[in-house]
C-alpha cells in the first residue's frame, strides 16, 4: 500500500467522508466480501457525500467547535449537523435482511452446527443466528449499584438455556472509544448471542460513556474518566460477589472487550491489581484491537517506534488523531479524560502508557489484533511489554480484517470469521490454566 507521509497527513485526514470505504474496497488484503460490501456503501452514500461537499463539510473536523459551548453541547451540535446530511444512514444499512446482504457480497457460507455446552442447535447458516433468541436466555432487565460511587449500572445477561450452572462467564465491555455505544445496542446484542452460543454466560456492563448516551440506553449518565472505568471494575466485582445468585463459576470469569472495551478490560485488570482483587478474573483478560493510547505524538507515529500499522493502515475505519488535530477533541484524550491533562497519560486511562513494573503480576492475557487496523502494531508492542513483565500473555492476528472486523464490524459479511473469534474467546474463558491441568482424562477427547 502507498505510505502516507507526515507532510500529507492533514490533507489526507480531511478527505471526503467515504475515504475509509474507498480504502477498504481497494485493499487486496481485506476479505473480498467486506470489500464488495464497502463498494456498495460507496454507491449508496456518494450522493450524501456530494451534498456535504457542496456545503464545504468534509467531516467532523470542519464542523465549527464553538469554544463557548460545553463539551457535551458541542457533541450534540455536531451529531445534529451530521444527521442533516444523512451520515447515520449506516444504521439503516446495518439492518439489511440477508437476501439484500447476499445480493451485495454473494452467497453466505453454509454454517457448521453451533456447539453448546451440551448438545447442538439445528444446523443453519451462521447469519440466521444474528437475530434470533433461539436456545438463549436473554435478560436485559438487571442492574446494580456501584460500590465505588453509587452509580446505577445496567447489565445485559445472555446465556444458552441448556448451559449447566455454574456458568463459565465473560464480563464484556463494549467498544466505542469509551465515549459512545451501548451493551444494549443491536450490534452488541448480536455479538453477545454469538458468544453465548459457544457455551458461555455473557454479562455486558453498560458503563458510563464519556461522550454521549446511546439510543439503546438514553438515560445512561455521561461522565469522563474515571466514571466508565469505575463502572467496569464495579461490574466485575458485582458479578464475583453475586456468583451464587447469578450461577456464575468464580473459577471461570473472563473480562473481555474490543477497541475501547479492550482498553477497559486491561485498565480493569490494573485496577484489580491495585485493589488486590485479581482473583476475580480467574480466566484472565481477552482484549481485542485495544485502543490503549489515545492520541500519539506525531513524532512517535512517524518514527516507527509503534510499528508501521499507523501508516500502513491509516484511514481504514480509524483515523487516530495526532498532535493538535481537531479530531483529538472528538475521539481521544480530551473527550475521555476531559480538559484535565493529568489523566492523559494515566495507565489506568490509557494502558499503552503502562510501564513494565505496572504490568507485573497481571493475570494471563490475550491481545487479539486485526491485520488492517491502524492499532495493530501498538497492540503487538503492548503484548511484548507484557512478556517483559513476565505476564502469561498471548497474541493473535486475524488476517483480512480491519478494526473490530472479527466481532461487531462486518459481522453480517463474514460471520464465519466472527464465529472463529467467538470460539477462541470461549476456549480462553472455559479452559483456563486451572481447568486445563485438572481436567479428567475422560473429559479430554484426544
Task: Name the predicted role of every residue range.
Residues 3-91, 100-101, 127-446:
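Alpha/beta-hydrolase superfamily serine-hydrolase fold, recognizing
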Amino acid at each position: 500500500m502507498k505510505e502516507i507521509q507526515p507532510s500529507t497527513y492533514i490533507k489526507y485526514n480531511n478527505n471526503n467522508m467515504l475515504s475509509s470505504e474507498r480504502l477498504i474496497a481497494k485493499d487486496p488484503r481485506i476479505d473480498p466480501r467486506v470489500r464488495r460490501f464497502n463498494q456498495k456503501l460507496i454507491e449508496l452514500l456518494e450522493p450524501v457525500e456530494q451534498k456535504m461537499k457542496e456545503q464545504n463539510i468534509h467531516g467532523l473536523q470542519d464542523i465549527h467547535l464553538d469554544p463557548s459551548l460545553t463539551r457535551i453541547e458541542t457533541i450534540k451540535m455536531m451529531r445534529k449537523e451530521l444527521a442533516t446530511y444523512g451520515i447515520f444512514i449506516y444504521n439503516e444499512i446495518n439492518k439489511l435482511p440477508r437476501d439484500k446482504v447476499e445480493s451485495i457480497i454473494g452467497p453466505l457460507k453454509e454454517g457448521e452446527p453451533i456447539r453448546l455446552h451440551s448438545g447442538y442447535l439445528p444446523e443453519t447458516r451462521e447469519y440466521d443466528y444474528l437475530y434470533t433468541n433461539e436456545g438463549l436466555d436473554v435478560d436485559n432487565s438487571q442492574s446494580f449499584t456501584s460500590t465505588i460511587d453509587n452509580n446505577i449500572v445496567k447489565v445485559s445477561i445472555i446465556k444458552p438455556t441448556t448451559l449447566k450452572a455454574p456458568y463459565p462467564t465473560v464480563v464484556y465491555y463494549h467498544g466505542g472509544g469509551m465515549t459512545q455505544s451501548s451493551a444494549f445496542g443491536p450490534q452488541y446484542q448480536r455479538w453477545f448471542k454469538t458468544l453465548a452460543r459457544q457455551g458461555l454466560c455473557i454479562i455486558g456492563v453498560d458503563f458510563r460513556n464519556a461522550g454521549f448516551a446511546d439510543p439503546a440506553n438514553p438515560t445512561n449518565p455521561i461522565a469522563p474518566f474515571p466514571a466508565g472505568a469505575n463502572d467496569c471494575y464495579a461490574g466485575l466485582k458485582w458479578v464475583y460477589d453475586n456468583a451464587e445468585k447469578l450461577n456464575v463459576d468464580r473459577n471461570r470469569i473472563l473480562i473481555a472487550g474490543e477497541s475501547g472495551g479492550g482498553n477497559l478490560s486491561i485498565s480493569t485488570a490494573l485496577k484489580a491489581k491495585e485493589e488486590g482483587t485479581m482473583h476475580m478474573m480467574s480466566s484472565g483478560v481477552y482484549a481485542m484491537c485495544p485502543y490503549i493510547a489515545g492520541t500519539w505524538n506525531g513524532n512517535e507515529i512517524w518514527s516507527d517506534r509503534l510499528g508501521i500499522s499507523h501508516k500502513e493502515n491509516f484511514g481504514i475505519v480509524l483515523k487516530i488523531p495526532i498532535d493538535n488535530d481537531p479530531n483529538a477533541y472528538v475521539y481521544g484524550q480530551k473527550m475521555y479524560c476531559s480538559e484535565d491533562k493529568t489523566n492523559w497519560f494515566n495507565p489506568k486511562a490509557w494502558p499503552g502508557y503502562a510501564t513494565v513494573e505496572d504490568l507485573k503480576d497481571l493475570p494471563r492475557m490475550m491481545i487479539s489484533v486485526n491485520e488492517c487496523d491502524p492499532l495493530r502494531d501498538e497492540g503487538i508492542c503492548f503484548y511484548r511489554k507484557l512478556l517483559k513483565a513476565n505476564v502469561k500473555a498471548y497474541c493473535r492476528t486475524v488476517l483480512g480484517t480491519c478494526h473490530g472486523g472479527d466481532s461487531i464490524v462486518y459481522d453480517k459479511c463474514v460471520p464465519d470469521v466472527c464465529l472463529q473469534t467467538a470460539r477462541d474467546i470461549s476456549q480462553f474463558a472455559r479452559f483456563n490454566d486451572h481447568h486445563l491441568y485438572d481436567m479428567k482424562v475422560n473429559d479430554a477427547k484426544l
